[in-house]
């Protein structure tokens, strides 16, 4: 009997999302986002799924949030209490920005441009970090770490790339821009990216010592200061990390 019950639970979790209760339009957008089963919904969460639908351009109301939450728990929307709905709305208001990110192949292409910049840093004896700013599918700025050369602690790749992009656009606010960077941003750079109102930040390798996108702190998840910028990582992570490791290995090799 326990095995049969376990089978039923697993079967229910993997049940395909259907209409009703979801509308055909919502269902189609969820499929485009790769959210097709109750397991997908439970893994991502009703609130983030709701925000992804909005980020994908779907016009939805609170009733869709109730439907998603109910589906994730295997109950009917009308079974949600008013207290549960109030909690959901509070969590929705506090949730960090969510975005639909480009296809992996597209993100990898732009990250390679950032990697080319990072290689220039390495060649100059600087810590190899590179960044690229993309708007409407085109690179409008690219830069690398030049702290030693410029004798300026603020000359991280992201800061220089933001300055270049601001000059190109004639505005320090980079609405609709994406920033690709080979290493998880530090607190200084994360703050600058948020203040520039960058739409999406895509980084390569995480930085366990100073990373401010989840490693030691997550500024992007601080709703009070971040209302515009979504973040994701791990794009060409191996290549980005290898470049850093090779740089420090060579540096130790030639130290007296």
Report the location of each language-model feature.
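Zinc-dependent deaminase
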Residues: 11, 48, 60, 67-121, ...
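Immediate flanking context of iron-sulfur cluster ligation sites
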Residues: 171-183
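A short, polar/charged loop-to-alpha-helix boundary motif
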Residues: 146-160
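A structural microfeature
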Residues: 141-143
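Helix-hairpin-helix
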Residues: 17-33, 48-49, 54-62
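Short beta-strand scaffold segments in enzyme catalytic cores
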Residues: 129-135
């Amino acid at each position: 009997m326990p095995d049969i019950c376990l089978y039923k639970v697993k079967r229910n979790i993997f049940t395909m999302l259907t209409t009703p209760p979801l509308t055909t339009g919502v269902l189609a957008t969820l499929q485009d986002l790769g959210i097709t089963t109750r397991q997908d919904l439970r893994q991502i969460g009703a609130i983030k799924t709701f925000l992804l639908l909005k980020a994908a351009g779907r016009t939805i109301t609170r009733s869709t949030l109730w439907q998603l939450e109910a589906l994730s728990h295997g109950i009917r929307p009308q079974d949600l209490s008013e207290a549960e709905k109030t909690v959901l709305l509070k969590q929705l208001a506090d949730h960090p920005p969510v975005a639909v990110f480009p296809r992996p192949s597209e993100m990898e292409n732009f990250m390679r441009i950032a990697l080319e910049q990072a290689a220039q840093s390495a060649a100059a004896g600087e810590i190899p970090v590179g960044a690229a700013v993309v708007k409407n599918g085109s690179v409008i700025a690219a830069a690398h770490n030049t702290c030693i050369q410029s004798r300026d602690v603020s000359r991280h790749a992201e800061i220089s790339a933001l300055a270049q992009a601001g000059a190109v656009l004639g505005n320090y606010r980079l609405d609709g821009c994406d920033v690709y960077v080979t290493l998880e941003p530090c607190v200084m750079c994360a703050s600058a990216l948020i203040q520039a109102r960058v739409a999406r930040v895509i980084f390569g390798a995480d930085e366990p010592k100073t990373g401010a996108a989840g490693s030691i702190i997550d500024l992007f998840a601080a709703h009070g200061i971040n209302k515009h910028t979504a973040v994701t990582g791990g794009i060409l992570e191996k290549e980005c990390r290898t470049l850093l490791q090779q740089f420090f290995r060579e540096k130790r090799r030639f130290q007296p």
